Amino acid sequence: MANDLLDNKGRGEAGWSWPAIHPEGRKYGLVVAAASLVTAFLAWETIAWPLAFLALGVLAFFRDPERIVPHDEKAIVSPADGMVSLISEVEPPPELAMADAAGNPGLGDAPLTRISIFMSVFDVHINRTPIAGQVSRLIYVPGKFLNADLDKASEENERQHLLVSRPDGLQIGFTQIAGLVARRIVPFVKQGDIVAVGQRIGLIRFGSRVDVYLPAGTAPAVIKGQKVVAGETVLARVGENRLLEGSAQ
């Protein structure tokens, strides 16, 4: 682990070393840092110091560490850093379930295993794709800003649905959900793009959640309460249906 912290290969704790900062964070950090310098120049120390710490916090929030992606075609990797807050059997949302206007199939309306990953404000908030393939669907839905850890947040909050499809027919749907503090989902990809497994596909600002829908016949390889790392932690392996103790909630 010590080497990971030094070379910043992204094995969970490596996120706390000093990785690259995403451009979204640089502009916010620069503004807050500039405000801190101005207030310090004016000798307003009671304001300058909090602003300086806030600038560091903004940069830490938007840190963007590299990740070691597993070379396993069956692997479905975590799209987000955070904690598995819920594993449940649910029907996919209509945006992912139904066929699109061109007749391309969705996930269907049969219940699938959904793994919900909650990202606190201390987690890396860059999201990554769970598999390689084509972004066959990307749908943004405006909504509320409830606590992202609540189950109903998946139906009522601002969210963005993505469907990644492989030539062999495998489709993985996942949803970025804005939270109580998060107020904007920022996409890095568009519909039709070809993506690699673990590729950066977007971010959600300041605390949020990502739901992943596993294909039928595939059991989760994680349990509720487990910490996961985007692009590295294997949530499941396609076709493997052995349930882990504690994975059924």
Curated annotation (Swiss-Prot):
Q: How does it sit in the membrane?
A: Peripheral membrane protein
Q: Recount the PTM note.
A: Is synthesized initially as an inactive proenzyme. Formation of the active enzyme involves a self-maturation process in which the active site pyruvoyl group is generated from an internal serine residue via an autocatalytic post-translational modification. Two non-identical subunits are generated from the proenzyme in this reaction, and the pyruvate is formed at the N-terminus of the alpha chain, which is derived from the carboxyl end of the proenzyme.
Residues bearing PTM Pyruvic acid (Ser): 208
Catalysed reaction, written as an equation: a 1,2-diacyl-sn-glycero-3-phospho-L-serine + H(+) = a 1,2-diacyl-sn-glycero-3-phosphoethanolamine + CO2
Query: Its Gene Ontology biological processes?
Result: phosphatidylethanolamine biosynthetic process
- The entry's keywords: Cell membrane, Decarboxylase, Lipid biosynthesis, Lipid metabolism, Lyase, Membrane, Phospholipid biosynthesis, Phospholipid metabolism, Pyruvate, Zymogen
Instruction: Kindly list the GO molecular function terms attached to this UniProt entry.
Output: phosphatidylserine decarboxylase activity
Q: In which pathway does it act?
A: Phospholipid metabolism; phosphatidylethanolamine biosynthesis; phosphatidylethanolamine from CDP-diacylglycerol: step 2/2
Principal location: membrane
Query: Which residues does the Swiss-Prot or TrEMBL record annotate as the active site?
Result: 208 (schiff-base intermediate with substrate)
List residue numbers at the site (Cleavage (non-hydrolytic)).
Answer: 207-208
Q: Which domain of life is it from?
A: Bacteria
- What does the note under cofactor report? Binds 1 pyruvoyl group covalently per subunit.
Identify which cofactors the protein needs according to its UniProt entry. pyruvate
List the EC numbers from the record: 4.1.1.65
Q: Where does this protein reside within or beyond the cell?
A: Cell membrane
**Gene Ontology CC terms, in alphabetical order:** plasma membrane
Subunit field text: Heterodimer of a large membrane-associated beta subunit and a small pyruvoyl-containing alpha subunit.
Q: Which NCBIfam families match?
A: PRK05305.1-2, PRK05305.1-3, PRK05305.2-5
Entry function:
Catalyzes the formation of phosphatidylethanolamine (PtdEtn) from phosphatidylserine (PtdSer).
Enumerate the HAMAP family for this protein: PS_decarb_PSD_A
User: Which family is it part of?
Assistant: Belongs to the phosphatidylserine decarboxylase family. PSD-A subfamily.
| Record protein name field | Phosphatidylserine decarboxylase proenzyme
Provenance organism: Erythrobacter litoralis (strain HTCC2594)
Which taxonomic lineage is given here?
Bacteria, Pseudomonadati, Pseudomonadota, Alphaproteobacteria, Sphingomonadales
Could you tell me the gene encoding this protein? psd
